[in-house]
Amino acid sequence: MRMRTLIVSAVFSIFGMVPASRAQEIGDVQQGRQFALDVCASCHAVRAGATQSPLATAPSFEEIAHTPGMTPAALTFWLTAQSHPTMPNLILSPQQVRNVSAYLLSLRDN
């Protein structure tokens, strides 16, 4: 688990250096939360304060939000790269990506 966190942190740190772009536009936190509850909650703990995901290997959304180097650009890459072997091959619209990113990053306040 620790090695995975370090690898994810390194990837996010690299993409955190990417200049601001359209991918960093603000999304709708409430729509992102609803999408997460509808689509992501079967594997991830998506609610604020929830730390134990239904799938033991899936990080909670709060863990993702607090990953060093986590930025909107890093989340955009993660949500659109479709290269994570255990995640379903979801195709999100640019607005859905912004919404989920906005919700995830809002969890830093908890």
Located regions from the model:
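Bacterial N-terminal signal peptides that target proteins for export
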Residues: 1-8
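Bacterial N-terminal signal peptides
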Residues: 8-17
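Electrostatic cytochrome c docking/interface patches
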Residues: 17-35
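The canonical Cys-X-X-Cys-His
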Residues: 32, 39-47, 100
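Detector for the c-type heme attachment site
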Residues: 43-50, 66, 80
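Conserved catalytic-core motifs of eukaryotic protein kinase domains, centered on the activation segment
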Residues: 53-55
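Extracytoplasmic electron-transfer domains, predominantly the class I c-type cytochrome c fold
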Residues: 57-105
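Short, solvent-exposed mixed-charge patches
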Residues: 109-110
